[in-house]
Amino acid sequence: LEILAETHGTRPDLTDQPIPDADHTWYTDGSSFLQEGQRKAGAAVTTETEVIWARALPAGTSAQRAELIALTQALKMAEGKRLNVYTDSRYAFATAHIHGEIYKRRGLLTSEGREIKNKSEILALLKALFLPKRLSIIHCLGHQKGDSAEARGNRLADQAAREAAIKAPPDTSTLLIEDSTPYTPAYFHYTETDLKKLRELGATYNQSQGYWVFQGKPVMPDQFVFELLDSLHRLTHLGYQKMKALLDRGESPYYMLNRDKTLQYVADSCTVCAQVNASKAKIGAGVRVRGHRPGTHWEIDFTEVKPGLYGYKYLLVFVDTFSGWVEAFPTKHETAKIVTKKLLEEIFPRFGMPQVLGTDNGPAFVSQVSQSVAKLLGIDWKLHCAYRPQSSGQVERMNRTIKETLTKLTLATGTRDWVLLLPLALYRARNTPGPHGLTPYEILYGAPPPLVNFHDPEMSKFTNSPSLQAHLQALQAVQREVWKPLAAAYQDQLDQPVIPHPFRVGDTVWVRRHQTKNLEPRWKGPYTVLLTTPTALKVDGISAWIHAAHVKAATTPPIRPSWRVQRSQNPLKIRLTRGAP
């Protein structure tokens, strides 16, 4: 035994010989027997003359498991002390000295590759071995009739365990879905983290009852609190605030350790709630990039208008981001051919070749035809985030302005042909002051548009116009006095600090489902973040970039133990085990 313990033992100083200067000498025993067709079980820790701890165990508990529980409880109560502990169980004795560590090294499997019995109790025992300052676990004979201290202590432990099993009250624990753990102090097991927190709170240990007390209530360990709150949440799927309000209103017989923190984690990690609840995160507004002079940066969009003459039902809108100048062309179809045709025949001859084009992800813009033409011409075509109209805010707002103006003009004139009224709508849009108090026409040409008063009797003064040289000098003055300050103002907006979104590569996120069917969750996923920009994300499984406002963080749900069915040698019996999936 000494050689095996030296080679395979868990604790190097663990011995099977009594420690002379021990603080405590205790005796442990577990009892399991049939009574009226039901298997009862109990465990106890005693001295020679006094019962220190005795508890009933769940019906059906085996004698081996009861012995492990009793020995583990003794080690926990002797934390930081020198302890001699006697047990008449060869199984518990050998597990503590040798077999437990061997099982652990084998992955808690038998030589046949099956999961060992009493897995959780063995792990708890191996962990508790390090709690006492010095430890000796000694095997003694069971059912001794002598009058030695060893015999008296063993008899008292056996009697206390049996009486605890017989006097066990009927099971009145609340039935919780997928969880049959009894939430009673008799089954509370405190971890090192729990004990540290309890000492910080100033809780007291009830040695006779075997649990900690704070504010006059038994303290429920952190793991039990998690299981209870997780079960309650899965029954109701209420949020953190409402669950907290319900718990505050109720009079719980227990003090729940780390209740609010655990409740927040349970609510955040629920995958069902994550797919349905709205996102509370607020993403800071970004800054739109504009051109540094007219004609370099355009935003393009198709907008649908009620059919006019000759079947025109679409409007292709170009907006210069620097000046706000708008060009709009009625079309019968929404195709890439029309986009490239208007770009080459209308925009390029009058304003020069654009450097940047910004659009949404419409079919006419993502088409290979449009992208190939832009690549050949050296145009940087930027596709905005899907379902994020703010990214194309300037052209989207212009669409609304044109439609509202056309509606007013059709009502005022009585005509239903909006194509005929489009030039008037464009004139209004081009001569409406922008954020800096200048109209797009004034930014582009340096002066208001010429207006003729046809009722003026002196028409001769309108016949003379400035020379070409005067026009060129005026345009140079416009570039100097208007364009440069305006470009500087746009640059100042870009230089303003932008609060980045909190998502990083490798994070798990939920993505908003923009078109939901009946009873379909509003979020899909979770997905892993692959790439990020200050305002958008690229995730696995979705080709388009996603704006940060359309995602929310996904909390990794806890791994819940699941039930598994195992065959037994008896064809009329099956074995149910619970463990990690």
Curated annotation (Swiss-Prot):
Catalyzed reaction equations: Endonucleolytic cleavage to 5'-phosphomonoester; DNA(n) + a 2'-deoxyribonucleoside 5'-triphosphate = DNA(n+1) + diphosphate
UniProt name for this protein: Pol polyprotein
Lineage: Viruses, Riboviria, Pararnavirae, Artverviricota, Revtraviricetes
Integrase catalytic domain mapped to chain residues: 290-448
UniProt-recorded Gene Ontology molecular function terms: nucleic acid binding; RNA-directed DNA polymerase activity; RNA-DNA hybrid ribonuclease activity
Function: During replicative cycle of retroviruses, the reverse-transcribed viral DNA is integrated into the host chromosome by the viral integrase enzyme. RNase H activity is associated with the reverse transcriptase.
All residue ranges annotated as the RNase H type-1 domain in the record: 20-166
Coiled-coil regions listed: none
